[in-house]
Amino acid sequence: AYTGQTGAPWGLA
């Protein structure tokens, strides 16, 4: 539930 490199709400790249 954290923002990743793409800003996705699951914190994926």
From Swiss-Prot:
UniProt keywords, alphabetically: Hydrolase, Protease, Secreted, Serine protease
Q: Can you tell me what the entry says about the temperature dependence of activity?
A: Optimum temperature is 37-50 degrees Celsius. 49% of maximum activity is seen at 60 degrees Celsius, no activity is seen at 70 degrees Celsius. Thermolabile, a significant decrease in activity is seen after incubation at temperatures above 42 degrees Celsius for 20 minutes.
Q: List where in the cell it is found.
A: Secreted
Enzyme class, one word? hydrolase
- What's known about how it's activated or inhibited? Strongly inhibited by pMSF, chymotrypsin and SDS. Inhibited by the trypsin inhibitors Tos-Phe-CH2Cl, Tos-Lys-CH2Cl and SBTI, and by bivalent cations. Slightly inhibited by the elastitinal and metal chelators EDTA and EGTA, by ethanol and by non-ionic detergents.
Q: Which GO terms describe its biological process?
A: proteolysis
GO function term, MF aspect, one: serine-type peptidase activity
Q: Name one GO cellular component term.
A: extracellular region
Q: How is it modified after translation?
A: Not glycosylated.
Q: How does activity depend on pH?
A: Optimum pH is 9.0. 20% of maximum activity is seen at pH 5.0. Inactive below pH 5.0 and above pH 11.0, inactivation by acidic pH is reversible.
Tell me its EC number(s), please.
Answer: 3.4.21.-
Protein family membership: Belongs to the peptidase S8 family.
The subunit field of the Swiss-Prot or TrEMBL record says: Monomer.
What this chain does, per the record? Serine protease. Degrades fibrinogen.
Recorded protein name is Serine proteinase
According to the entry, what is the taxonomic lineage of the organism?
A: Eukaryota, Fungi, Dikarya, Ascomycota, Pezizomycotina
